[in-house]
Amino acid sequence: MPRMIEGTLSAEGKRFGIIVARFNDFISDRLLGGALDALMRSGAADENIEVAKVPGAFEIPLIADKMAKSGKYDALICLGAVIRGSTPHFDYVCAEASKGIAHVSLGAGIPVMFGILTTDTIEQAIERAGTKAGNKGWDVAMGAIEMVNLAEQFK
């Protein structure tokens, strides 16, 4: 039987950085609330969580990179909401934010989690920020906890 390697869901003693886009803050504030709730319920201490607010999703990768390079965090959580409009702006912002976060994640040596909603409508965003479809902020924070504990097994 092969050995299974999995991460636990304990945030005790772990340090988390959260980068949140202010644009569409009626959604991103709910995502942040879900992420903080997940971290606290999983044992994270208030003093081990820092939140950086950026103007929009496009700016998240730069601050994520700086936070990752600081060595202060075990994982980063990137949160925001990009809602499709009538121009191609949505496509550019989504593509560059996701590429930037992936780039930081691969170079950082720590989990950098993607929690940016990319939806066609405001209603879809609201559903994913704490109503019908759960709270993706919570989901991404739980993923960060699991990934921190999994990654530690490879040191």
Swiss-Prot record:
CDD domains: Lumazine_synthase-I. It comes from the Bacteria. The active site is at H89. Pfam families: DMRL_synthase. Keywords: Riboflavin biosynthesis, Transferase. SUPFAM superfamilies: Lumazine synthase (SSF52121). (2S)-2-hydroxy-3-oxobutyl phosphate binds at S86, T87, R128. It is an enzyme of class 2 (transferase). Pathway: Cofactor biosynthesis; riboflavin biosynthesis; riboflavin from 2-hydroxy-3-oxobutyl phosphate and 5-amino-6-(D-ribitylamino)uracil: step 1/2. One of its GO terms (biological process) is riboflavin biosynthetic process. GO terms for molecular function: 6,7-dimethyl-8-ribityllumazine synthase activity. The keyword Transferase applies. Its EC number is 2.5.1.78. Catalyzes the formation of 6,7-dimethyl-8-ribityllumazine by condensation of 5-amino-6-(D-ribitylamino)uracil with 3,4-dihydroxy-2-butanone 4-phosphate. This is the penultimate step in the biosynthesis of riboflavin. This is 6,7-dimethyl-8-ribityllumazine synthase. The gene is ribH.
